[in-house]
Amino acid sequence: MSATKLTRREQRAQAQHFIDTLEGSAFPNSKRIYITGTHPGVRVPMREIQLSPTLIGGSKEQPQYEENEAIPVYDTSGPYGDPQIAINVQQGLAKLRQPWIDARGDTEELTVRSSDYTKARLADDGLDELRFSGVLTPKRAKAGHRVTQLHYARKGIITPEMEFIAIRENMGRERIRSEVLRHQHPGMSFGARLPENITAEFVRDEVAAGRAIIPANINHPESEPMIIGRNFLVKVNANIGNSAVTSSIEEEVEKLVWSTRWGADTVMDLSTGRYIHETREWILRNSPVPIGTVPIYQALEKVNGIAEDLTWEVFRDTLLEQAEQGVDYFTIHAGVLLRYVPMTAKRLTGIVSRGGSIMAKWCLSHHQENFLYQHFREICEICAAYDVSLSLGDGLRPGSIQDANDEAQFAELHTLGELTKIAWEYDVQVMIEGPGHVPMQMIRRNMTEELEHCHEAPFYTLGPLTTDIAPGYDHFTSGIGAAMIGWFGCAMLCYVTPKEHLGLPNKEDVKQGLITYKIAAHAADLAKGHPGAQIRDNAMSKARFEFRWEDQFNLALDPFTARAYHDETLSQESGKVAHFCSMCGPKFCSMKISQEVRDYAAAQTIEVGMADMSENFRARGGEIYLRKEEA
């Protein structure tokens, strides 16, 4: 918890200073590397952690060292992780994918925006001070064309995005030569198909089958391609967004950059306050990762927060507005059907999803079927024209342990499976959202039900939280469930911060949530047996056994916290080379004792070997030279 609570003015000033002074930067003793592909412009960024050599012998005056290989790791920070790139938030990021989009020849620039709301915002001079200056001219598919990665995959095309992803998912492990580092335990994948080497062809085939998605709106060319699917690395989403009572554009951009630095694979902008449109433009133009939204939130703002006043026309206009800004995936609560709402009446906590409750209220007040369900094909037509992926929302997810795995939850899930098939008719990419609050023994059923009824479309879950008794620590309660469901096959985990159920997260809360979920995702990758997942663990264990403290800090998910905890008790520079830590001290360090045992055993082996040779020499009569047949 922060020691001093800042005022709103101080928070905004701090965020503005962060933006004004933002520079590309690497983690301690890391450097940015790029691995090139065959398609023009495919340069895949990774972070390479530099390690110190291991002392293997020699004398104090002339020590002998053995080099340790640098460890390449997946990097979501985009240009913000490259010290060589000049960052200017006012101008936005470079449009990495623009040449690839243009080369396909199936899009056209729009001379007029499709959304009436966008037109009104652009015409409002009073918003000039808030507006992002370099507004993108949006594109859409030419008439008769679909521009989704699923469409290309089904046609057998390997796009530059697919090659980029294949290189990225392999995490540079082909650069690692050490057998010690490459050693990996077999995983238990629960039916997932994890190849030894991820190729662009494999990426294409998984997308074509609907088992994976590449969220990549043609109007978000700044994003670096990534993939969500159970046969790939488990991904983590971070939520940001302003509300009616707190946060500003500056703070949301700061949270975006902060999120990508700490490992967010995607970011959802859940803004519900003022200037949603302008905030989103700033976020998209500065985001190297896909951005998702829940369009019903903004649609509700347009009708002054009155759910009953929502209409398909308002919602459709919102979809067009956001698609032309560059939103990469929409959460759509189209599975909350009128007949399912009564199923929640006996729940302890009712309907806890904001989107789900909005649609349930609309259905009941009009006594009509959910207009998102009724107009789902039109939603798909819009998504196909911009390559917006659909994240089919779990509006009836359980909000408490008692309500887990109930009739309403699974009824909605089955409907999401039906909608998945409809979306695929339009070549629209789909993932399925999941719970929620589920005790550990009931988690796996969620994965098996999703795979069966949603046709192996990627699963994307909020946790799940495994107990309800720990407000303030729900990043832990949910991290447990997240690791489990990630192992069972969940493709992306939506982070939970310490502020869950309590308030809007700040910058530090975002970091805590992300670190917790990166741990959960990595633990799931290890358990699944994702190729190369264990390399970093092996490097850490080797550094730990050899008391290479600096390397231990730098290999950590959070080097700064690891160093700070160590230095609380051993702050002197000598503590960075000591063969012990403050937990056990020099006389009781198990690893130091293990090293001594290993050295002793090696010496004993030599002595025993020499004794055996001596006895053998005497048994042969002590002759220096033996006849050939005796040798």
Curated annotation (Swiss-Prot):
Gene Ontology process terms (BP): thiamine biosynthetic process; thiamine diphosphate biosynthetic process
UniProt pathway annotation: Cofactor biosynthesis; thiamine diphosphate biosynthesis
Sorted UniProt keywords: 4Fe-4S, Iron, Iron-sulfur, Lyase, Metal-binding, S-adenosyl-L-methionine, Thiamine biosynthesis, Zinc
Gene Ontology, cellular component aspect: cytosol
Membrane recorded as keyword: no
Known partners and oligomeric status: Homodimer.
Name listed for the protein in its UniProt record: Phosphomethylpyrimidine synthase
Cofactor: how and how many bound: Binds 1 [4Fe-4S] cluster per subunit. The cluster is coordinated with 3 cysteines and an exchangeable S-adenosyl-L-methionine.
EC class: lyase
Family: Belongs to the ThiC family.
Record-linked PANTHER family: PHOSPHOMETHYLPYRIMIDINE SYNTHASE, CHLOROPLASTIC, THIAMINE BIOSYNTHESIS PROTEIN THIC
Catalytic activity, reaction form: 5-amino-1-(5-phospho-beta-D-ribosyl)imidazole + S-adenosyl-L-methionine = 4-amino-2-methyl-5-(phosphooxymethyl)pyrimidine + CO + 5'-deoxyadenosine + formate + L-methionine + 3 H(+)
Cofactor dependency: [4Fe-4S] cluster
Keyword Protein biosynthesis: no
Name of encoding gene: thiC
Reported function: Catalyzes the synthesis of the hydroxymethylpyrimidine phosphate (HMP-P) moiety of thiamine from aminoimidazole ribotide (AIR) in a radical S-adenosyl-L-methionine (SAM)-dependent reaction.
InterPro entries: ThiC, ThiC-associated_dom, ThiC/Bza_core_dom, ThiC/BzaA/B
Residues annotated for Zn(2+) binding in this entry: 437, 501
Residues given in the record as substrate binding sites: 239, 268, 297, 333, 353-355, 394-397, 433, 460
A GO term for molecular function: zinc ion binding
Binding locations of [4Fe-4S] cluster: 581, 584, 589
EC number annotated for this UniProt entry: 4.1.99.17
